[in-house]
């Protein structure tokens, strides 16, 4: 687990962009192990 990961199931990195933007203010991240990891 990491501080910039979201407990959100994903199948593609683009599915993480909007949740990452809502959570951290940057629409940038990737799908790792079916979870979203956001870059901040």
UniProtKB/Swiss-Prot annotation:
Cellular localization per UniProt: Secreted
Pfam annotation, one family: Toxin_2
Gene3D superfamilies documented for this protein: Knottin, scorpion toxin-like
Disulfide bridges in this chain: 2-5, 10-31, 16-36, 20-38
Alphabetized GO MF terms: ion channel inhibitor activity; potassium channel regulator activity; toxin activity
InterPro entries associated with the record: Scorpion_toxin-like_sf (IPR036574), Scorpion_toxinS_K_inh (IPR001947)
Residues flagged as site, Basic residue of the functional dyad: 30
GO cellular component, as recorded: extracellular region
Keyword Disulfide bond recorded: yes
Aromatic residue of the functional dyad, annotated site positions: 39
Alphabetical keyword list: Calcium-activated potassium channel impairing toxin, Disulfide bond, Ion channel impairing toxin, Neurotoxin, Potassium channel impairing toxin, Secreted, Toxin
UniProt tissue specificity: Expressed by the venom gland.
Note: The N-terminal C2-C5 disulfide bridge unique to this toxin does not appear to confer stability to the protein.
Functional description taken from the UniProt entry: Inhibits high conductance calcium-activated potassium channels. Reversibly inhibits Shaker B potassium channels.
Domain comment quoted from the record: Has the structural arrangement of an alpha-helix connected to antiparallel beta-sheets by disulfide bonds (CS-alpha/beta).
Family the UniProt entry places it in: Belongs to the short scorpion toxin superfamily. Potassium channel inhibitor family. Alpha-KTx 12 subfamily.
Protein name: Potassium channel toxin alpha-KTx 12.2
Species whose genome carries this gene: Tityus trivittatus (Argentinean scorpion)
Taxonomic lineage from the root: Eukaryota, Metazoa, Ecdysozoa, Arthropoda, Chelicerata
